[in-house]
Amino acid sequence: YKRQAIDKAMDRGLLGKDILGSGFDFDLHISQGAGAFVCGEGSALTTSIEGNRGMPRVKPPRTVEHGLFDKPTVLNNVETFCNVPPILLNGAKWYQGYGPANNHGTKAFALTGNVQNTGLIEVPMGTTLREVIFDIGGGVKGGAFKAVQIGGPSGGCLCISATEDHLDMKLDFDSLKKVGAMIGSGGLAFDLSLIHISEPT
C-alpha cells in the first residue's frame, strides 16, 4: 500500500520534481530492512538502510549530525509525521486540547492478544487502561487477567490484582513513568499466557 500511495502521489504531481509548479523537489523511497527490533534505534536504522547489519552506533555524533550515508538525517516515526498536517492546519493550541498537561496530543496503541477487539487505535493521551480495555477493546476474553504488557519488550507490565490495580492508570508518559513503565512502541498485549504469571490467587 505504501508503494501504491507513493505512485499515486507521483502521478498527481505531489511528489518528484517541481511539485505543483513550486520549484520544490521531494522524493520518497521505501527501504525494507530485516525487521530487527534494534532498528527502532535511530543509528541502527540508518545502518540497516545503508545495507549493513542494523547495529546502534556510539553517540555522539547523533544522526542529525552524521546519519544516513554520513549526512545529517532527521528520523521520526510514522506517528509523528501523521501528527504534523493536522497541527499545521489547526494550530498548536488545538493539539494541546487533547491529553493532560505536559502530555498533549493523541497516541496510537496496538491492542493484541486476549481482548475481544484487537487492532490499532488512537486515543487522547491520559485515556485510562480501563477505557481502552472495556470501551474500545470490548473486554478480555474469559473476563480474568493479571497484567497488560505495555510498550514492547522494554515497556513493562501493568498488574491487575487485589494489591496492585492499574485499571485506572492513565496512559500517558508521566503517569506510566511513576509506576516504572513506559509507552514505548505503543503495544498493549493481553495474552492468555499472562494468566499464569506467578502470583497467589
Region annotations inferred by a language model:
Residues 4, 195-201:
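Residue-level detector of conserved catalytic or cofactor/ligand-binding positions
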Residues 159-182:
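Eukaryotic mixed-charge, acidic/polar low-complexity intrinsically disordered regions
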Residues 143-147, 152-167:
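Terminal amphipathic helices with adjacent charged low-complexity linkers/tails
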Residues 127-132:
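Short, structural beta-strand-to-alpha-helix junction motif
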Residues 104, 181-185:
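Short, solvent-exposed loop/turn segments at the edges of secondary structure
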Residues 47-50, 110-113, 171-178, 190-192:
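Short beta-strand elements
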Residues 5-125, 137-140:
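Hydrophobic alpha-helical positions that pack around
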